[in-house]
Amino acid sequence: MLQLGATTPSFDLEKEIDATYPTEHISRALIEEVIPTFEGEQWQVPPMFSAVKVDGKRAYKLARQGEEVELKAKLLVIDEIEILRFDEEKMQLELRIVCSKGTYIRALARDIGLRLNSGAHLIALRRTRVGDICVEDCITFEQFTTLIDNEIK
């Protein structure tokens, strides 16, 4: 889920909002026009708060030390991007995204905000699939602990 109209240095809730932007011009029609432009191959600059290595050091460590470095854009693929819900009052946008390995959804939030001539950051993320493993095929934490307890007995 994206919060439109504000950005953070980490592109998510890890850091406080550092800037706010107009949202009066953002409508469902504009979102429906902009979102499909993200399907296909995209060049994406990773967030500073990421595990990408810069001269052998993790970018997030450098960012936490206050150092700014230029990260190189990486080619990725967004196979599908679908609008699930847009709350015009709260300026929150929920999407379903099928993407390639290495895609930073936080950076995608940033890029969507920019294309909407505003800002955006990620406020919620739920992975529903990693490779061939789908959330529907998984067990809950409670089910896991029950299995472990039964194995120990």
Residue ranges and their predicted role:
Residues M1-K153:
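Catalytic/RNA-binding core of pseudouridine synthases
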